[in-house]
């Protein structure tokens, strides 16, 4: 089993993908994916992944697998705008690489306002 606890550093396997006012913050016991001072008119993203630059057939995670985490938002739902989520997907919309578009294959936990 692979365990990543982010207590001291972000392992080099994790590539950072930050847009707009997205930030990664190590707290000493966790990793926070932060979108600071944003509004509903601008895209922002704080992400780690391990598939940038890989062909889909080389993506590292395959079933069966287990993902355990603790997640929370810093504001009440009524103050959030946009989308947020975490999980596994096949990057169907070419967000982080030069791949042809494809149908989504995902297990994703998702928030949308």
What are these regions (language model features)?
Residues 32-113:
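Secretory/extracellular carbohydrate-interaction modules
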């Amino acid at each position: 089993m692979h365990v990543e606890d982010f207590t001291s550093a972000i392992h080099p396997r994790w590539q950072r993908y930050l847009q707009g006012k997205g930030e990664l913050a190590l707290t000493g016991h966790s990793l926070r994916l932060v979108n600071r001072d944003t509004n509903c008119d601008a895209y922002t993203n704080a992400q780690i992944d391990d598939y940038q630059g890989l062909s889909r057939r080389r993506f590292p995670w395959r079933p069966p697998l287990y993902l355990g985490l603790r997640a929370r938002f810093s504001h009440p739902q009524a103050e959030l705008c946009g989308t947020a989520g975490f999980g596994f997907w096949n990057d169907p919309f070419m967000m982080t690489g030069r791949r042809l578009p494809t149908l989504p294959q995902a297990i994703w936990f998702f928030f949308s306002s």
